[in-house]
């Protein structure tokens, strides 16, 4: 009886891990487990475009038509159609950060009125709730994130520091 129970538990675990791999979430260039958990919880502060936040974390950005967004630095990809917005993180420690989006959009990171070069990006269209993740080296000065080209009015966004071994620092709202 006990052996059957253990066998059943193992089968469920194998099936669950297979489902995650099948839906594409396990196929990003780096792990997005923390973002999956955060986005799956569904509780986010709604942030209007042009808002300032005190620090990194996860939030839901309420976008507006791109034509109405006033970008600090001209977008690298132009002013695509769709929706966009900007948000400034007022205090952020220096380091490598992973910024993950729930939907398709472009993103620019800006510090000291200059675009921060993107170090890496990965995207998938087969991971429910997560579309893309990018990494930047950030200085310890305010960080403005510019978004555009989204076809949805609300975008879940996480800004999490990457640890030295490229794991994500733990963050809870």
Model region roles, listed by residue range:
Residues 15-16, 129:
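Short, intrinsically disordered, low-complexity segments enriched in Ser/Thr and Pro
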